[in-house]
Structure formats: structure tokens, C-alpha cells
């Protein structure tokens, strides 16, 4: 098949949507498909264009057999709701000339639109209509719902317009996929028939991310004694994620210097969180940059306890991608989730970690006390078993490929 992917994030971004889209593109190319991607300069999660891509306009490169068309965009130094809108629309403006160029090239069989941003779908839908391709919309985050529930957009007319635009794009899609059951319910409630829906969860390469010993972790590199306890948060440090509770909870462990809080990543809240820890005199709270993929197994093995923290308003609109790696590494996570959401249900049903109330430093401190004072081996064993059974990269991508083949009635050569 010839597959064209539209998405604002792609490799070499190490985390978030770009990681998964990049791995998907590379996997399809490895199966012999002709794959191209229209994407932005890499900028996430640092919100800073990577050095190797600075000062360039529209470029083309090959990554793991995939033709990658990069377009310029505006990346704000400080992310606000208004600046994020400008950021996304600047990307759409950059896509326009490349879109026209693609219309003149050999037709693609499948167009995959990765959302957010959801309005990128207008380019994908238009291409599919004009060239007779099949369109699949893959939803990593219900962006308009999130903007409403997080209070980022409060104007009713604007929200109505956005929901109508979203419905139009969903109606034009030949298939719609998402990453969790909670998102599926919301998507079906928008009028998408179940026959068009495809479950396509985020995955993990369980052959790469696997349990390691403490001796194989980053403890020696970071000067952390093997007998000490480590609480790890790794990922995007966004302003709206409520990560202050990590610092607040760490204050409860001030008199336990053998308990280390490691915050690994970048984002708009990093400097503020570091300032909070410094002002509180919390020397056991340490900050490190996001680690490269090849160090991820060692990073995950460093922790006794992992933190997966979400705000209440996130509910089932997003599914934390960091959890897949934690489970594959056989890690025990403290997860903040609202009862009834997919995240809560999965964690509870399979007993994969410790569930706490979101946005509560008290609940986090209590969960940490529990985690640091009991044998976590059963949690770790169940986590790895779950990853092997439900999150296998090869298994999930093969299943998704089968859906694409059905859409195009393409007989894959074996």
C-alpha cells in the first residue's frame, strides 16, 4: 500500500504522539509499504525546535524508510491557549503548499490523519476526496472536548463551530480509531457508527523495554545508592498538569533523605517546579532532562515507584502514553484517575498499581507511604504480564494493518 500520514508530531521526538506516529511509519515501511509523512519540525516536549532543524524551511528527509516532508511552524517559548492556537494554525499554513504538491504526485491508497490538531483533518479529508483515497482519522486526544473541559475555550459559539467541524471530519472518515475504551464511548456518542470504529491502543516494544536490575539502571550514573528508594516522574512538564503535588508530597518525606524524587523531562512548568523545590529546601528532589530512547529501560529500572498523574478534567479525553513503558518495564505506578474512566478501570481490574484521587497531594503522599512500605513484586509481575498480553507493538500494528488492508481491499504480497 501507499500510505500518507498527516501529523504535527513525528520522529525524532522521544515522547508523546510523535513517538508513536514515528514508530508506526517505520513499522509500515519495514513491511514493504510506501510511506510518506507530512509533519512539522521536531519541537516536543521541549517546545523548542531541535537544533538540527533550526533555520530550515520546507525540507524532505528519509527516516527508517519513510519519506518525511517537514514544514515550518511557529513554536512559542511560553505556551498559552492563544499561542497554542497560533502555533497550530501556523503549521496548517506551512502544510498548504506541500498539500498542493502531493496532489500532483502518484496517488496514495490510504491517508491517516493523526489528531490533535483535529483541523489538520481538512487537508487529509480533501486529499482523500480529490484523489480517491481512503481516510482514517486516528484520535490520540479529543482536543475540542479537552479545550471545553479544561476551560481553555469558553465561548459557546466558538465551541459549537469547533464541534461541527469535528463532526464533519469524522463523517468524512472511512474509519475512526482511538486509544482507549473511554475515548471510544465519546467518539460513538458523536455519531460515529461502531462499524467505522477501530480500537488502536498505544503500544510498547516489549523486547526493548523490559525489566532490568538496579545495577543496570541509572543509579550509579546519578549517584543514588542502591538501597535508597526512588520515586520517578518522567514526561512532559506542562503548566496544566498539576505537577505541583509532587513537590507538595515530597515535603512530607523531608525527614527521609533516602527517598529520592526524580523529575525527568521538559516543559513549561519545569522552571517553576524546580524553583518550588529549591525554595522549600528539598534537596532530595532532583531534575534531569528527558532521556534518549536507548536509555529508557535503564531510566525505568531506576525507580521503585513511578508517578502517572492526571487532572480530574482530563478524564477519558487522554490516555497517558508513559504508562505503556512503565508496565513493560515491570514497574509499579501510582496513578491518579477518576473511577469509571478507562485508566481507572484497567488499573483496578488488572491490579497494575496504586490508584489515588487526582489533584490531591494528601492522596499522593498516602499512596507513596503505601508503596514505599510494602512488597511491590506482585504489582510488577502483573504489569509485565499485562504489557506482553495487551500492549505488544508488533501485535497491535499487525491488527491495524489488517484494518487498512480491508479498507483498500489490497492483497498484501507474502
What label would you give each PLM region?
Residues 182, 203:
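Carbohydrate-associated surface elements
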Residues 1-64, 414:
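N-terminal subdomain of nucleotide-sugar transferases
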Residues 359, 363, 377-405:
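A charged, aromatic-enriched C-terminal amphipathic alpha-helix characteristic of glycosyltransferases
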Residues 241, 289-298, 306-327, 333-345:
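Nucleotide-sugar-dependent
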Residues 262-265, 270-297:
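Nucleotide-activated donor-binding/catalytic signature segment of Leloir-type glycosyltransferases, i.e.
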Residues 100, 119-122, 126-130, 157-176:
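Membrane-proximal helix-turn-helix segments that form the acceptor-binding/catalytic region
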Residues 51-58, 210-224, 380:
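A short helix/loop element that forms part of the nucleotide-sugar donor recognition site in Leloir-type
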Residues 225-241, 247-250, 262:
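Conserved donor-binding/catalytic core segment of Leloir-type glycosyltransferases
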Amino acid at each position: 500500500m501507499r500510505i500518507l500520514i498527516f501529523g504535527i508530531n513525528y520522529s525524532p521526538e522521544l515522547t508523546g504522539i510523535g513517538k508513536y506516529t514515528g514508530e508506526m511509519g517505520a513499522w509500515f515501511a519495514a513491511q514493504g509499504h510506501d510511506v510518506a509523512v507530512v509533519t512539522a519540525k521536531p519541537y516536543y516536549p521541549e517546545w523548542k525546535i531541535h537544533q538540527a532543524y533550526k533555520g530550515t524551511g520546507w525540507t524532505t528527509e528519509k527516516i527508517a524508510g519513510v519519506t518525511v516532508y517537514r514544514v515550518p511552524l511557529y513554536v512559542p517559548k511560553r505556551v498559552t491557549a492563544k499561542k497554542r492556537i497560533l502555533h497550530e494554525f501556523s503549521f496548517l499554513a506551512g502544510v498548504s503548499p506541500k498539500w498542493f504538491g502531493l496532489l500532483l504526485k502518484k496517488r496514495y491508497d490510504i491517508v491517516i490523519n493523526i489528531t490533535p490538531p483535529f483541523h489538520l483533518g481538512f487537508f487529509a479529508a480533501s486529499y482523500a476526496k480529490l484523489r480517491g483515497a481512503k481516510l482514517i482519522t486516528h484520535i490520540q486526544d479529543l482536543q475540542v472536548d479537552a479545550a471545553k473541559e479544561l476551560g481553555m475555550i469558553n465561548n459557546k459559539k466558538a465551541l459549537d463551530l469547533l464541534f461541527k467541524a469535528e463532526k464533519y471530519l469524522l463523517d468524512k472518515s472511512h474509519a475512526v480509531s482511538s486509544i482507549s475504551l473511554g475515548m471510544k464511548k465519546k467518539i460513538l456518542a458523536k455519531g460515529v457508527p461502531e462499524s467505522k470504529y477501530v480500537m488502536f491502543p498505544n503500544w510498547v516494544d516489549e523486547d526493548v523495554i523490559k525489566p532490568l536490575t538496579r545495577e543496570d539502571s541509572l543509579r550509579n550514573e546519578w549517584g543514588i545508592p542502591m538501597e535508597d528508594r526512588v520515586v520517578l516522574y518522567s514526561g512532559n512538564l506542562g503548566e496544566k498538569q498539576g505537577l505541583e503535588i509532587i513537590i507538595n508530597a515530597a515535603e512530607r518525606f523531608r525527614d527521609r533523605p533516602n527517598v529520592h524524587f526524580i523529575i525527568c523531562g521538559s516543559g513549561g512548568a519545569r522552571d517553576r517546579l524546580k524553583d518550588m523545590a529549591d525554595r522549600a529546601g528539598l534537596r532530595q528532589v532532583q531534575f534531569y532532562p528527558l532521556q534518549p530512547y536507548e536509555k529508557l529501560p535503564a531510566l525505568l529500572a531506576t525507580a521503585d515507584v513511578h508517578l502517572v498523574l492526571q487532572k480530574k478534567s482530563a478524564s477519558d479525553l487522554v490516555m497517558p502514553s508513559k504508562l505503556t513503558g512503565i508496565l513493560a518495564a515491570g514497574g509499579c505506578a501510582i496513578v491518579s484517575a477518576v473511577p469509571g474512566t478507562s485508566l481507572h478501570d484497567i488499573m483496578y481490574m488488572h491490579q497494575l498499581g496504586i490508584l489515588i484521587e487526582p489533584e490531591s497531594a494528601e492522596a499522593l503522599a498516602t499512596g507513596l507511604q503505601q508503596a514505599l512500605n510494602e512488597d511491590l513484586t506482585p504489582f510488577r509481575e502483573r504489569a509485565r504480564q499485562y504489557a506482553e498480553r495487551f500492549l505488544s507493538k508488533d501485535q497491535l500494528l499487525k491488527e491495524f494493518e489488517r484494518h487498512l488492508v480491508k479498507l483498500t481491499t489490497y492483497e498484501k504480497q507474502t
